[in-house]
């Protein structure tokens, strides 16, 4: 039996689009049989895949005044081109304002008259027109100091304006530098290197149906105190007939047990056990295909370099949740280290033995679950890994015609018959909660 033929019972999903079609139909005892059908059209997202909220504000009273009242946050939030335009205009306006003031002082003092008709010291040396006053304003605020133009003791008001312009220039510089640094160091940019799987999956874990999705960190720098949470968002009508378009329900990811706090060094599968307290308790595979809800997942933590809190968000619509699938392993042990293969991060494989019924029916009707010793994809991968190691060691004695040793063939037959679980091999399962 070849490796390719052994992998045939499992359908590998390589993309989100393919995953929407690999859905099993009902079979005996509530289990699927691998048939294919299509899903309904997607609803509008509340949170996009990139974490942006799909909302638009309208009819806000005094919006401009409120945004201007919090000018610093406004400058940090707006786009770079608008922020640079605002500061450029601020500098230009201050130069023009003080240039006009120095020009008015020169006119009032008679400094613009011909030199032979003045007979007194000017307020600002070498200022004979508005352009010269404007250049003096720029030199004062930027401390260029060419040396041709300077204020004298003749006019105290000119001295006062030089001091005032220096203070205004420092304020603008400080505000601009602070806004630029805050914008560059914003922790939300760290969220660009935090990854969520394209799909969530529902599968059995320790005899219970669980909702699972995968998170990963693309940088070697850690997310300190990382923790996850999730909410189910769906429309609801109350007992009084009130319609709530986006009702938010918490989804437990192990808060009471501390399982929501994760060590995000390698990709981790987040797990929500579908029990009596879960909003998904009564949802079966058929309900999932027609239901209208969205699961918003959030990963929070502190950036190691700056200790600032960052948040990464994503969401899964009902048609992005693959029932009866599991994630492919991405973490492998290789020589003296662990290797993470991100090409498998979004991939899933189908588990035909997953019950099609809801977790509620599974508990109440006591459907028979597959044996804990049944052959699974991870065991098959470990089996192939051991086979490859045997070949690398040059142990070719006793090989059968299809490339397997008698002991390997015995293990394989025993696993297919449900006789036991393959012992742990160098290729191991991914880190999971």
UniProtKB/Swiss-Prot annotation:
Coiled coil: none
Residues binding K(+) 4: 145-146
Membrane topology value: Multi-pass membrane protein
Protein origin, superkingdom: Eukaryota
Cytoplasmic side: 1-77, 184-433
Principal location class: membrane
Keyword hit for Disulfide bond: yes
Binding site for a 1,2-diacyl-sn-glycero-3-phospho-(1D-myo-inositol-4,5-bisphosphate): 79, 81, 183, 188
Signal peptide, first to last residue: none
Site features described as Role in the control of polyamine-mediated channel gating and in the blocking by intracellular magnesium, chain residue numbers: 173
Binding site for K(+) 1: 143
Activity modulation: Activated by phosphatidylinositol 4,5-biphosphate (PtdIns(4,5)P2). PtdIns(4,5)P2 binding to the cytoplasmic side of the channel triggers a conformation change leading to channel opening. Inhibited by Ba(2+).
Residue numbers spanned by region Disordered: 387-433
GO cellular component: membrane; monoatomic ion channel complex; plasma membrane; T-tubule
Cellular compartment(s): Membrane; Cell membrane; Cell membrane, Sarcolemma, T-tubule
Membrane-traversing stretches: 78-104, 156-183
Binding residues annotated for K(+) 3, in chain numbering: 144-145
Bridged cysteine pairs (disulfide): 123-155
Keywords: Cell membrane, Disulfide bond, Ion channel, Ion transport, Membrane, Metal-binding, Potassium, Potassium transport, S-nitrosylation, Transmembrane, Transmembrane helix, Transport, Voltage-gated channel
Gene Ontology molecular-function annotations: inward rectifier potassium channel activity; metal ion binding
Gene Ontology annotations of biological process type: muscle contraction; potassium ion import across plasma membrane; potassium ion transport; protein homotetramerization; regulation of heart contraction; regulation of monoatomic ion transmembrane transport
Subunit structure: Homotetramer. Forms heteromer with KCNJ4. Can form heteromeric channels with Kir2.6/KCNJ18. Association, via its PDZ-recognition domain, with LIN7A, LIN7B, LIN7C, DLG1, CASK and APBA1 plays a key role in its localization and trafficking.
Function: Inward rectifying potassium channel that probably participates in controlling the resting membrane potential in electrically excitable cells. Probably participates in establishing action potential waveform and excitability of neuronal and muscle tissues. Inward rectifier potassium channels are characterized by a greater tendency to allow potassium to flow into the cell rather than out of it. Their voltage dependence is regulated by the concentration of extracellular potassium; as external potassium is raised, the voltage range of the channel opening shifts to more positive voltages.
Protein name per Swiss-Prot or TrEMBL: ATP-sensitive inward rectifier potassium channel 12
Species, as recorded: Homo sapiens (Human)
Gene giving rise to this polypeptide: KCNJ12
